[in-house]
């Protein structure tokens, strides 16, 4: 089959041409939009990149103030490397504005959407700059210390009281003391109280135990 042999011979050439056209030389120039904004603290460094698919592009950065429309864009010069990196070693308030890159390759010009650089004052660091895990461990240690301070003194007092009771015999029963409980009372006063209580017992009668016919109530 001569037709089949010719097709097999042309297959490597077709693969080579397809690979060459799929390479960077046959692709259209494309520039990534990039982040819409970048926030940097005052005095820190900032980096802006211009991502593109060019092989040897000519990258130029432009700058404009968003608040001043009448002020024309200012060219900042070429970027560094194939990504056209724009580097600020120390950012200040004058660096605020809109930055975009312009890529030229083979007379084809592309621009990025632009990135607005925000410069803010650094956030003051707290007095105790600790993570949440460290704070939780400190709170747990404080709880254990408070529990220790509450339980240990009370336990020591209980053991001390028990030791005193065992040493001086406070809790031991004393039969002699129970027998002489009323030793200090005056016997004359006791007999007088008994006479008075006995005299009051006959003043009132139990009405429930009396018969109706024999009921004779005493006059007050």
UniProtKB/Swiss-Prot annotation:
B-cells. Its main location: membrane. Disulfide bonds join 50-101. Disruption phenotype: Mice display impaired B-cell development which does not progress pass the progenitor stage. Changing residue 198 to K: Associates more strongly with SYK. Increases calcium response upon BCR ligation. The keyword Glycoprotein applies. This is B-cell antigen receptor complex-associated protein alpha chain. Residues 160-220 are cytoplasmic. The record marks 204 as: Required for binding to BLNK. Glycans are attached at residues 58, 68. Residues 171-199 form the ITAM domain. InterPro entries: Ig-like_dom (IPR007110), Ig-like_dom_sf (IPR036179), Ig-like_fold (IPR013783), Ig_sub (IPR003599), Immunoglobulin_dom (IPR013151), Phos_immunorcpt_sig_ITAM (IPR003110). Residues 1-28 form the signal peptide. Pfam families: ig (PF00047), ITAM (PF02189). It is a single-pass type I membrane protein. Residues 29-117 form the Ig-like C2-type domain. The gene is Cd79a. GO terms for cellular component: B cell receptor complex; external side of plasma membrane; IgM B cell receptor complex; membrane raft; multivesicular body; plasma membrane. The modification Asymmetric dimethylarginine is found at residue 198. GO terms for molecular function: identical protein binding; transmembrane signaling receptor activity. It comes from the Eukaryota. The chain crosses the membrane at residues 138-159. The transmembrane helices of CD79A and CD79B chains and two IgM heavy chains assembly in a four-helix bundle structure that appears to be conserved among different BCR isotypes. It is found in: Cell membrane. The modification Phosphotyrosine is found at residues 182, 193, 204. Changing residue 193 to F: Strongly reduces tyrosine phosphorylation and pre-B-cell differentiation. No effect on constitutive internalization of BCR.
């Amino acid at each position: 089959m001569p037709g089949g042999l010719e097709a097999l011979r042309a297959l490597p050439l077709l693969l080579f041409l397809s690979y060459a056209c799929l390479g960077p030389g046959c692709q259209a120039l494309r520039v990534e939009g990039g982040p819409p904004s970048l926030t940097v603290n005052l005095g820190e460094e900032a980096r802006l990149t211009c991502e593109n698919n060019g092989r040897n592009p000519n990258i130029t950065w432009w700058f404009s103030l968003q608040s001043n429309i009448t002020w024309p864009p200012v060219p900042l010069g070429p970027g560094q490397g194939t990504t056209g990196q724009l580097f600020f070693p120390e950012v200040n308030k004058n660096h605020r504005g809109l930055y975009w890159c312009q890529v030229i390759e083979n007379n084809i010009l592309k621009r990025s959407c632009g990135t607005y650089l925000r410069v803010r004052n650094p956030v003051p660091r707290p007095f105790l700059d600790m993570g949440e895990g460290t704070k939780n461990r400190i709170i747990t240690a404080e709880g254990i210390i408070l529990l220790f301070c509450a339980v240990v003194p009370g336990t020591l007092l209980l053991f001390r009281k028990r030791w005193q009771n065992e040493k001086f015999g406070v809790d031991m029963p004393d039969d002699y003391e129970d027998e002489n409980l009323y030793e200090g009372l005056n016997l004359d006063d006791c007999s007088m109280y008994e006479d008075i209580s006995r005299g009051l017992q006959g003043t009132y009668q139990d009405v429930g135990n009396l018969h109706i016919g024999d009921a004779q109530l005493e006059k007050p």
